[in-house]
Every structure is written in structure tokens, then in C-alpha cells.
Amino acid sequence: MSDRLTLLRPDDWHIHLRDGAVLPHTVADVARTFGRAIIMPNLVPPVRNAQQADAYRQRILAARPAGSRFEPLMVLYLTDQTTPEDIRTAKASGFVHAAKLYPAGATTNSDSGVTSIDKIFPALEAMAEVGMLLLVHGEVTRGEIDVFDREKVFIDEHLRRVVERFPTLKVVFEHITTGEAVQFVNEASANVAATITAHHLLYNRNHMLVGGIRPHFYCLPILKRNTHQASLLDAATSGSGKFFLGTDSAPHAQHAKENACGCAGCYTAYAAIELYAEAFEQRNALDKLEGFASLHGPAFYGLPANQDTITLVRDEWTAPASLPFGELTVIPLRAGEKLRWRLEEHA
């Protein structure tokens, strides 16, 4: 087995960079590895139109390390009030590549999200017409639905209806976590794809709950049982172009995670491709990593693949115990633990 793995430079099709003083830290971490990233719009207030997306994009570009060519791909935050004109203006900008459906209350900063799917049908119709992708956080939020079942129920109650109603709309089912989601994507048309996180490939709910509650494993959608983890590994390593890399790296300050009511999100951007390599190596599928990380996403988005490369080397190193996060700190996933692959840094 080779101790070096060279890939076309990957992209991250789902990341949270946050805003303000933390941007120099979060942008540096993603730009170290990825050529482009789909930037989540769930700021406070959210990124609802092309003008706000451009302002956020400029802040991200200003935070890039010297010499970086990292490109942020912007996303609109759908609300009940999003209009077809909002969609057309965003598409015409050239820098907004998708719009994001957050069911209201489903995750961090989703309170302004969609309260009823039917309310955004005019916007979805416009998206289908102009070729803008729909990104979906696929969980219902009704209190009587068990948190471990919310993805499956969303598929049955909402997602099937959306893809049937808008067959030409390209849909990315983001950060899928269940066997049911894998099956849905596999059986859907070529216009439906999914992203998978490194933490959902490497971990299941036992890692979060057995032997004590580990808040840095807490994310939404929540980690599921190991049978679902196995389904995700099958999908990611299958070679299917329907599945591609999206870290959902979502930093929160240490005090907000280590809390009686801790925030949801795992910070993986600092070592994302290294973590994915571990997952693919578990399945003896390192030969499938380039497709998943570097090729399938651009193809689905209608963009060219990156032309430069990165190299991973099998060289054990210890993840930092904490990382700077503005004036605070963030605890990364695997803090203080050994990682088996290291990104080779070029001078």
C-alpha cells in the first residue's frame, strides 16, 4: 500500500465559515486544502439576496491568506418571502451558485428558515428555470418526531414531493446520515445528489454517548447507529457520481459546545481531507477518494475540476488540542488525538 496519495485539488461542497473576527482562521483552514467551497448562508442576519451574498463574499476574499486562490461559492438562504426575482438576480450575479432550504428551527441560525415547503414553490420554479441548485437540510422539526428519525420523515413528507414537482431542479441532499437517504438518492433521477461529512463516515452515535456525553461529536443531523454509518461508507466509496464531499465543518467557540445546552456542529476543516482519507482507507477504497473529493461535485454543479493537485502522506501526527477562533478558541474534532494522514505542505 502506497504511503503517498496525490489527488486533484478537492472542493468542499458544504462549509460554515461564520463571520467577523473568526474569518481569518476559518478561511485559512479551508483554503489550505480546498480550491472552492460552497459557503453556508446561515449568518445572523442570514444571507437572503445577491447584495448580501456579495458583501459576505468580499469579507471572505479579504480574509484569504496571502497568495491564496481559494474561491468562495455563495448561497442564498431561502425564506418564506424569497421571490423569483431574488433567484434571477442571484443567478445573474455569477457568484451565487445555489439556494439553501433550512426548515425553520432545524439547526444553527435556522429560525428565519422555511415554515412550509409550499411557500417557496415559486422560488423553486424560478431556480429550475435558471439552473440554480437547491441545497437541502433534510430534517423535519416537529417536536413529536424523534431526533433520530427526522431525516427519514423529511424524505417521506417533503423531499419526494419536491423532486417529483420539479424534475429539472438539481437538488443536493446535504450531509446525509441514514441508509434511507442513501437509497433515496440512488433511486432518484440524475438531478439528485448528496454530500457526506467525514464525521458521519468515521463515527456513529455510540462515539457520542457511550462512556459519557462527548459534546464535540454533537452535530445536526445527529450521528446515527452504526448500520447507517455503514450505508454512508458504502455510498461514499461506491464511485457513484451522486455522492461527494461536503464537510459541514461548523465551528463554535469552546464555551458554546461545552455547555449545559451545547451547540450543534463539528469543526473538521483543519484536517478535512486527512479525515476522509482515514474513512476511505477503512474500506480499502483510497482509489475512490479523488472522485468523491475532487470530481463528482464539480460535475454535478457544472463546473470544471481543479487542475492543480494535493498530496497526502502516511505520517502520523497529533491534532491540536484547540485552535484560535477570533479572540476565543474552538476545539476541533479529534483534538489531541492521532491522525494517520498528513497533507504535504508545499513551500
From Swiss-Prot:
Keyword Metal-binding: yes
EC primary class: hydrolase
Cofactor note: Binds 2 Zn(2+) ions per subunit.
Keywords: Hydrolase, Metal-binding, Pyrimidine biosynthesis, Zinc
Xref: Pfam families: Amidohydro_1 (PF01979)
Binding-site residues for Zn(2+) 2, renumbered to this chain: K100, H137, H175
Entry-annotated residues carrying N6-carboxylysine: K100
Binding site for substrate: H16, L17, R18, N42, H137, L220, H252, A264
Record-listed Zn(2+) 1 binding positions: H14, H16, K100, D248
Name the record gives this protein: Dihydroorotase
Source organism phylogeny: Bacteria, Pseudomonadati, Pseudomonadota, Gammaproteobacteria, Pseudomonadales
Name of encoding gene: pyrC
